[in-house]
Amino acid sequence: MDRSQEHYANGDQNLEANLIDHEVVTESSSSAVPQTENYKRWLRVSIYVIFVLFCQPLATILGRLYYENGGNSTYVVTLLQLIGFPVLVLFRFFSRIRQPKSTDTNFSQSPSFTTLASVYLCTGLLVSAYAYLSAVGLLYLPVSTFSLILASQLAFTAFFSYFLNSQKFTPLIVSSLLLLTVSSALLVVNTDSENSTNVSRVQYVIGFICTIGASAGIGLLLSLIQMLFRKVFTKHTSSAVTDLAIYQSLVASCVVLIGLFASGEWETLPSEMRNYKLGKVSYVLTLASAAISWQVYTLGLVGLIFESSSVFSNSITAVGLPIVPVAAVIVFHDRMDASKIFSIILAICGFLSFVYQHYLDEKKLNTSHTSAVGDLHLPVEEGHTNIQSV
């Protein structure tokens, strides 16, 4: 009996040791997986940030370069922001191959064809509207002024996110809205310093109003996309990001093409290319480069919304704010007076307020997530204690 009891005791100890080892291995592996996924997520975010920071300023400069050297078609500049979507088909194919198996346990169904068609149609129409308004604004405004006014999209994003995504108006966000508003107001009252031989005061005001409208359209679109990812695209995949970017650009391109032919501007394009100051080859390269830059920027923007939020994606857009005015001074010899410098400083301060608020939100979210994970381990420890007491 003593040997039998000793045998059973040794068996219980071995069983207990195996259970403890299994628990340690399971816990370490489960903690390693989220860490790996976190690294991959930040790698994707970094790529999207690079797309946004470099492609939007480049596309804006190229659009102005088209106007400065003999281009006159606002529909062409509008189309440049949209027509490059076939470039994303390759990215869509790549993301489908590399897409990891979903770990979502909600088993949510994919949106119906009718729902997807409605989403792509509505967002495409909105994209075509703000793209045309921004093309008109870029025609009548110096590129540095245009980029500074367009920075007010950050304020519009917060405004629309308040209604669509329950965005809270903290003191930092309110101060950011005020700074961005004052920054734009300085530019509208500074029309005399922007005097141009080719642009009248009325055209300047039209450009300002159109740019503000484009900024509001961008803010509405970004907030709407964030809501769609929360309520419609419940399966969070990179394919959903690229599909949205491709199909909304397809719809918007069709709308703008209809406008191009209906307005008769297409008839002037051959002579415009012949008379382009930099030559025919430069004409084609300028348009092609701008189209690709705009589409890569769109991919980065939608990707940041998918990985974080519309406010964060717009904040990253605002990081490139100083790039365009400085480049405009070098390339197009735009005036950089005291009021414009002060406007840049105010816009950057408004951007920093947004970024700091986002940092506080992320920190709070990570703290709550860590606390939740700690609570989940408590039952395991109690079960482990019960095993030891058997």
Swiss-Prot record:
What kind of membrane protein is this, topologically?
A: Multi-pass membrane protein
Q: Name one GO cellular component term.
A: membrane
Q: Which Pfam families does the protein's record reference?
A: PUNUT
Its predominant location is membrane
The biological processes this protein is annotated with in GO are: purine nucleobase transport
Q: Keywords for this entry?
A: Membrane, Transmembrane, Transmembrane helix, Transport
Keyword Transport among UniProt keywords? yes
Give the family per the record. Belongs to the purine permeases (TC 2.A.7.14) family.
Q: Where in or outside the cell?
A: Membrane
Extract the GO molecular function terms from the UniProt entry: purine nucleobase transmembrane transporter activity; purine nucleoside transmembrane transporter activity
- The identity of this protein, by name, is Probable purine permease 7
Q: Give TM segment ranges.
A: 42-62, 74-94, 110-130, 131-151, 169-189, 205-225, 244-264, 286-306, 312-332, 341-361
